[in-house]
Design a protein with these regions (language model features):
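Conserved, mostly hydrophobic/aromatic
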Residues: 4, 12, 29, 57, ...
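Active-site acidic/histidine proton-transfer and metal-coordination neighborhood
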Residues: 43-133, 141-143
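Generic structural signal for well-ordered alpha-helices
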Residues: 1-2, 22-26, 50-54, 84-91, ...
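Structured loop/turn residues at beta-strand edges in well-structured enzyme cores
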Residues: 7, 34, 60, 130, ...
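N-terminal pre-domain/capping segments
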Residues: 1-64
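Long hydrophobic alpha-helical segments typical of transmembrane helices together
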Residues: 182-207
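Acidic/histidine-rich catalytic cores of soluble enzymes
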Residues: 96-186, 192
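Hydrophobic faces of well-ordered beta-strands that scaffold small-molecule active sites
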Residues: 12-14, 36-41, 65-67, 101-103, ...
Length: 207
């Protein structure tokens, strides 16, 4: 965290911090002038004990509670409907507590399902805008064969956060890359985000 602060970052996302207690993470971030703006939190814990998840985020001073990936059992035409049903209660609890459930996608959400829609369409249809936001990942939108700028425009009111990640190629292989070292049009992407003005946090990610 000290190194991030020295680079000049002022906001961070927490993900996979292991057994470090929320209070300890808050103290570490506070000591380095970093504000926690988003987490990726175990979705199973959200289902079993959403009250504790909300309480932990109160300690962290973090409003946005993120699902890093849809659990595999939901990644079917029937499963995605179960996902929206199962997570509706924690999403409402988070909203009522002044938080927002955030969903981070990959590329499989663009897979066409039986209804002719894709999985992302179902999420947007079933969850009202005040119940779920989308953490858009520039790499994974491109990997899905979708247009990054069109997707940003479509999801603008849900995009509290955007993961900035580039895509490079080696032969026929797609590779994650540092922003600016791949082929995504980040000048165009950033100008669009600035013009729309709905995204609060741009989070640089390097898997």
């Amino acid at each position: 965290m000290r190194q991030l602060a020295q680079i000049g970052y002022r906001t961070v996302q927490l993900s996979a911090v292991g057994q470090i207690a929320p209070q300890t993470m808050r103290e570490i971030c506070d000591e380095n002038g970093l504000t926690i703006v988003l987490t990726h939190t175990d979705p199973e814990r959200m289902l079993v004990n959403p009250e504790d998840v909300i309480a932990d985020h109160d300690v962290l001073g973090c409003r946005l509670i993120g699902i890093g990936s849809m659990p595999p059992r939901y990644r079917t035409a029937e499963g995605v409907r179960r996902f929206t049903a199962d997570f509706m209660v924690p999403a409402k609890m988070m909203r009522d507590a002044g938080k927002r459930l955030m969903y981070h996608h990959h590329n499989f959400e663009w897979e066409r399902i039986d209804s002719g829609q894709n999985m992302l369409d179902v999420l947007l249809e079933d969850f009202a805008q005040d119940l779920i936001g989308i953490t858009l990942d520039t790499y994974w939108v491109q990997a899905a064969g979708a247009d990054v700028c069109d997707t940003i425009t479509r999801l603008a009111e849900r995009l509290d956060c955007v993961h900035l990640k580039d895509m490079a190629v080696k032969g026929f292989e797609q590779r994650m890359a540092v922003v600016g070292e791949g082929n995504l049009p980040f000048g165009k992407i950033l100008k669009l985000l600035q013009r729309l003005g709905t995204t609060r946090y741009l989070l640089v990610e390097q898997d």
